[in-house]
Curated annotation (Swiss-Prot):
SUPFAM superfamilies xrefs: Ribosomal protein L10-like
GO biological process: one example: translation
GO cellular component: large ribosomal subunit
HAMAP family linked: Ribosomal_uL10
Role this protein plays: Forms part of the ribosomal stalk, playing a central role in the interaction of the ribosome with GTP-bound translation factors.
Subunit structure: Part of the ribosomal stalk of the 50S ribosomal subunit. The N-terminus interacts with L11 and the large rRNA to form the base of the stalk. The C-terminus forms an elongated spine to which L12 dimers bind in a sequential fashion forming a multimeric L10(L12)X complex.
Domain of life of the native organism: Bacteria
Organism of origin: Geobacillus sp. (strain WCH70)
Name used for this protein in its record: Large ribosomal subunit protein uL10
Family per similarity comment: Belongs to the universal ribosomal protein uL10 family.
Annotated keywords: Ribonucleoprotein, Ribosomal protein, RNA-binding, rRNA-binding
Pfam families linked: Ribosomal_L10
A GO term, aspect molecular function: structural constituent of ribosome
Length: 166
């Protein structure tokens, strides 16, 4: 019997570590999804570097107490799955929101963003943000704009001087 207790303690420690290490965590109710749909969701999340796991609610509540996120205890009723992302803050919210639009059975319950409990509204707002790559490309275009404008002005001045000398 003690080996079962030790195994449960290891699982609680694993869950707590995942909550600590992840930049973004989203909790969903997956009740009503069939195996093919869950497999498709797992595939999309895995491609984005997001880990999607199902744990017993009692073990998850103990891990939440260990991490200091007891405010999420009310969320853990019924079948739940947790999406952990160590890299991209936006990825789990974006993928799960897009999937929930196509599959009404998937319900986003709450989340944790960089150690702070996030409401459903905050998760939805996060899902509407562009991806990290999209934000970087926007930043790059903003940084390139002055240089591009300077180059165009310099070319226009050179063309004008060329016309005057001709």
């Amino acid at each position: 019997m003690s080996s079962a207790i030790e195994l449960k303690k290891q699982i609680v420690a694993e869950i707590a570590e995942k909550f600590r290490a992840s930049k973004s965590t989203v909790i969903v109710d997956y009740r009503g999804l069939n195996v093919a749909e869950v497999t498709e969701l797992r595939k999309r999340l895995r491609e984005a570097g997001v880990e999607f796991k199902v744990y017993k609610n009692t073990l998850t509540r103990r891990a939440l107490a260990e991490v200091g996120l007891e405010g999420l205890n009310d969320v853990f009723t019924g079948p739940n799955a947790i999406a952990f992302s160590k890299e991209d803050v936006v990825a789990p919210a974006k993928i799960l929101s897009e999937f929930a639009k196509d599959h009404e059975a998937l319900e986003i319950k709450a989340g944790v963003i960089e150690g702070n409990i996030a409401t459903l509204e905050e998760i939805n707002a996060l899902a509407k943000l562009p991806s990290r790559e999209g934000l970087l490309s926007m930043l790059l275009s903003v940084l390139q704009a002055p240089i591009r404008n300077f180059a165009l002005v310099a070319k226009a001045v050179a063309d004008k001087k060329e016309e005057q000398s001709a």
